[in-house]
Design a protein with these regions (language model features):
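Acidic/histidine-rich catalytic neighborhood of metal-dependent amide-processing enzymes
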Residues: 141, 146-227, 498
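Short, solvent-exposed loop/turn segments at the edges of secondary structure
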Residues: 125, 172, 205, 227-233, ...
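Acidic/His- and Gly-rich active-site-bordering loop/insert found
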Residues: 27-147, 166-173, 366
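Bacterial N-terminal signal peptides
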Residues: 9-23
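An extended, acidic, His-containing surface patch that forms the Zn2+-binding/catalytic region
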Residues: 187, 218-219, 282-361, 369-382, ...
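Bacterial N-terminal signal peptides that target proteins for export
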Residues: 1-11
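Polar, glycine-rich mid-to-C-terminal structural blocks
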Residues: 234-310
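Metal-dependent peptidase/peptidase-like ectodomains
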Residues: 198-201, 206-263, 271, 376-422
Length: 499
């Protein structure tokens, strides 16, 4: 990505000192006042989220920087953070914040303020407008890019801070926040943020790190993830110039009879990476995944019996799982298997009608999901060696971001507090070996911090990375929390972590 000095990355250091009328507090005595404050502040909290959705930061397009970080800092200040210091890094702007409540325990937060690209033509309403619409049978939802991934849950968490302070209550824990603006391109520079001495020092005091999340499915069921898959994002580029065969510029397609095609060269290379059905990785010497344990298989079996297969297929707009696997086996495959996925293919003419050319260049955008104990560096090295061995060494492999998978013990204080909090809402949460998606939790779970890390939050949304992404604001399903309920879940979680 082309960069200019104007878009130099910065990190905003924020500190917050909270005061309260009393040094004594408990979830039981404080809850009613805080809940009343949440209801009172509903409209302003929703408006805050709408405004944030309107502030777009897309790393892949170099759009919305450094404004996105500045806006993130403003949100923090509005929630009570008092001091900010800008720190230059090599990455896009990040935010490091600390909240000192003079509490006995400290909890880490991971935020992202960037969002995925979007095509407005594919949406039912403008993706940056954050329009609130009726969506039967869910209730009122907010439609917008970032609504559920991840600004909605993060805004609900910030609303919890506003409500605690507005109710005149003392924060039960200290907080350390790390927010980045490159999550959607594989978080290539988050180590530079987290491994700064002052950030490491703050995080080392934490009992764990969590990311605000909308954990409920369409039935209101909650699964607690004990980790996440890792990921590598990259481009495979085939060009006539680099190959030494085919044209160095687009030429008339009639010449295909005597000139090699870089596009076909790329297709043939892609074909060697997977089985004929595209579902089994065939890369030579590729890292092997760690098999699921008996305990993990039992978790998957329990979840498969509880969560609706029909609702899952409806949500994902699919009719069949790979190889027509039954629900439990499809879930087991989801949790245990690495993947090689084609995100997009770009080459030649893609406009209306036809254009008889032989393209000089073709690109495949790829993501590769990793499970424990696979390492991103090993997977990338195996891919490069495989292509070279198979006669495709000329194809460029440009990694744009990525990181290792994460794992957290179910017995950690972070996870046990989640289970206890969900129980307060009448939910017996299910344990899930790992989120099939990815986030850069490895910087917290790996050396030198080795902290528990995960996701938490009630509420529901869907459509991340897709058109009409949504987040429930007012739920008509008593099993699913709306925005205010999600906000209260964060309040209860902080009090639970303080125990």
């Amino acid at each position: 990505m082309k960069r200019t000095r104007f878009f130099s990355r910065t990190v905003l250091v924020l500190t917050l000192h909270w005061t309260a009328s009393s040094s004594c507090y408990s979830a039981e005595t404080d809850a009613a006042a805080i809940k009343t404050e949440i209801t009172k502040r509903h409209e302003e909290a929703v408006k805050r989220l709408q405004d944030w959705v309107g502030q777009v930061s897309i790393a892949a397009e170099n759009r919305g920087y450094p404004e996105g970080a500045e806006y993130m800092a403003k949100l923090a200040r509005d929630a009570g953070f008092q001091q900010a210091t800008v720190i230059n890094t090599d990455g896009k702007p990040g935010v490091f914040a600390t909240l000192d409540a003079s509490a006995l325990k400290t909890v880490g937060l991971y935020f992202m303020y960037d969002v995925k690209q979007f095509d407005p033509a594919e949406w039912s309403s403008p993706p940056t407008e954050a329009r609130i619409v009726d969506k039967p049978p869910l209730g009122k939802v907010m439609i917008g890019r970032g609504a559920v991934n991840q600004k909605g849950p993060e805004a609900a968490f910030l609303a919890a801070l506003h409500a605690i302070r507005g109710a005149g209550k003392k924060m039960p824990v200290n907080l350390v926040m790390v927010a980045e603006g490159e999550e959607e391109i594989g978080s290539p520079h988050i180590p530079q943020l987290v491994r700064r001495p002052e950030v490491l020092a703050a995080l080392k005091k934490c009992v764990g790190v969590f990311m605000p999340f909308a954990a409920q499915d369409l039935d209101g069921v909650v699964t607690v993830n004990l980790g996440s898959k890792g990921v590598i994002e990259l481009e495979l580029v085939s060009s006539g110039e680099k190959w030494g065969r085919g044209p160095a510029k687009d030429i008339h397609s009639s010449l295909k009879a005597m000139v090699d095609s870089p596009a076909w060269h790329l297709v043939k290379a892609l074909n060697t990476l997977v089985s004929d059905d595209g579902n089994v990785i065939m890369i030579d010497n590729y890292p092997k995944p760690l098999p699921l344990t008996a305990e993990q298989k039992a978790m998957i079996e329990k979840v498969s019996k509880t969560r609706s297969e029909a609702l899952a297929k409806k949500q994902f707009s699919v009719q069949h799982w790979i190889n027509d696997l039954p629900w439990d086996q499809a879930n087991e495959r989801l949790e245990s298997q690495p993947t090689v996925n084609i995100e997009g293919l770009v080459g030649g003419y893609t406009g209306p009608g036809g254009k008889t050319i032989l393209p000089h260049r073709a690109v495949a955008k790829i993501d590769m999901r990793l499970v424990p104990d696979m390492k991103a560096a090993d997977a990338l090295a195996a891919l490069k060696a495989h292509l070279a061995k198979r006669g495709f060494g000329d194809i460029e492999v440009n990694m744009t971001g990525g990181y290792d998978p994460t794992a957290t013990s179910k017995d950690s204080a972070l996870i046990q507090a989640q289970l206890a909090t969900y129980k307060k809402f009448g939910i017996d949460a299910l344990l899930w070996p790992r989120n099939a998606g990815s986030y850069p939790g490895y910087v917290f779970t790996g050396e030198p911090l080795k902290l528990a890390a995960g996701h938490f939050g009630l509420g529901h949304g869907s459509g991340a990375h897709a058109p009409d992404e949504y987040y429930i604001i007012e739920s008509t399903n008593p099993k699913i929390q709306g925005f205010d309920g999600a906000t209260m879940s964060f309040v209860e979680y902080l009090y639970e972590l303080a125990k």
